[in-house]
Design a protein with these regions (language model features):
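Residue position within the beta-strands of beta-propeller blades
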Residues: 1-8, 47-52, 95-99, 151-155
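Residue-level signal for WD-repeat beta-propeller blades
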Residues: 42-43, 56, 88-89, 107, ...
Length: 177
């Protein structure tokens, strides 16, 4: 998957290629649909991109986009997602998503990390509050799961709003895992 500016006046578009460098499907021309994504395989065995949609009709929602044809499935019903990770290779079928936006227009997830089921059921496991006010890129939480999906690590200044410093690493363990 190549992501970038493929046409004048546009940014954050994606094009999928096979291993021989041949295009697969059409250019994903909508801005950031998805953005801040990670790649994985879903419950049907399809290669997908999982991330936040930065365009309508699913603005702010977590979506998955099938690489072979660009089909989109909305995975969450609310919030404005940020970073997504599917590095939980031993817990397939889930994406770990950081919600760092805390405005009144984006409930129900404010400044927290969640696990989102990839099957379209809109099942979300709430994991932890981030306590991570975003002051610049280095203070973004960017939560990432362990390979078994039982723990999540993220960056946080734990509420130091003015400077966002110092930034430390925090780990949460998922209950019952």
């Amino acid at each position: 998957v190549a992501n970038g500016k493929f046409s004048e006046g546009q940014g954050d578009q994606s094009q999928v290629y096979d291993l021989q460098g041949n295009r697969i499907g059409a250019l994903w021309s909508e801005y950031g649909r998805p953005s801040h994504f990670d790649l994985t395989i879903d419950e049907n065995g399809d290669d997908i991109a999982v991330g936040v949609s930065k365009s309508k009709p699913d603005l702010g929602r977590v979506i998955k986009r099938r690489l072979r044809d660009g089909a989109v499935t909305v995975l969450t019903s609310g919030g404005f997602a940020g970073h997504s990770s599917t590095r939980n290779l031993d817990r397939p079928g889930w994406a770990y998503v950081t919600y760092q936006y805390s405005g009144p227009d984006w409930p129900p997830f404010w400044n927290e990390v969640v696990a989102v089921k990839l099957d379209g059921s809109q099942i979300v496991e709430r994991i932890a509050h981030l306590h991570a006010p975003r002051t610049d890129y280095l203070t973004e939480a960017h939560a990432v799961p362990s390979p078994d999906g039982k723990r999540v690590i993220w960056a946080s200044s734990w509420g130091a709003k003015a400077s966002g410093r110092p930034v430390s690493a925090y780990v949460a363990r998922l209950k019952g895992r």
